[in-house]
């Protein structure tokens, strides 16, 4: 499960998130990236904001017709688009080896989902930056979404969310936490490739 070339970072999500993302993309200009959002509405909005800032981005979600979706996929693979803003519908069966960054605009619903989505970066063994924006408000929003679902489903959903939140709030090596979640032991004290190892938080 260890992907040594992936860099994991969690940033606080503030009202300047769009500006933060634009700055990040411009600093990585010409590189391919995927930005995951939880809602289709946010996917559309963010893609428009990026386009207005002269970033070659396109939206992708299950509500679009299949010909638009496959055209977007093809253009991404052929490097005609730099950035895909997507719901988690994107990426199944997409094997673009040189995706250089994966950004989570919203906290993922589970660590397994997070691992799969971040895993789309750096498949060629090159650089892969995995940046997640996190706020406790997001967490409350997701918990609200679950109301009205069967109790058992709510319980599982909450537990998965709590695990993701604990990961986001932790000051421990992110690689160690992820591998531990999948039942693997990571013996190094410092992976040298996550925010917590490179910039330890003051306890």
Question: Positions of the model-derived regions?
Answer:
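Helicase motor core with emphasis on the C-terminal RecA-like subdomain
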Residues: 1-151, 159, 186-188, 193-196
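Cys/His-rich short segments
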Residues: 160, 165-203
């Amino acid at each position: 499960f260890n992907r040594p070339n992936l860099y994991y970072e969690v940033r606080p999500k503030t009202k300047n998130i769009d500006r933060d993302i634009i700055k990040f993309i411009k600093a990585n200009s010409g590189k391919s990236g995927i930005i995951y959002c939880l809602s289709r509405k946010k996917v559309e909005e963010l893609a428009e904001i990026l386009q207005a800032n002269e970033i070659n981005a396109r939206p992708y979600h299950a509500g679009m017709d299949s010909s638009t979706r496959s055209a977007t996929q093809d253009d991404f693979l052929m490097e005609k688009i730099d950035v895909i803003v997507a719901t988690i519908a994107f990426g199944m069966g997409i094997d673009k080896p040189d995706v250089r960054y994966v950004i989570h605009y919203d906290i993922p619903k589970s660590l397994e989902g997070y691992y799969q989505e971040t895993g789309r970066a750096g498949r060629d063994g090159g650089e892969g930056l995995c940046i997640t924006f996190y706020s406790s408000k997001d967490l409350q929003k997701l918990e609200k979404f679950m109301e009205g679902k069967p109790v058992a489903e709510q319980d599982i959903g909450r537990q998965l969310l709590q695990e993701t939140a604990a990961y986001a709030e932790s000051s421990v090596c992110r690689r160690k936490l992820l591998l531990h979640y999948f039942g693997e032991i990571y013996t190094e004290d410092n992976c040298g490739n996550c925010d917590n190892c490179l910039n330890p938080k003051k306890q």
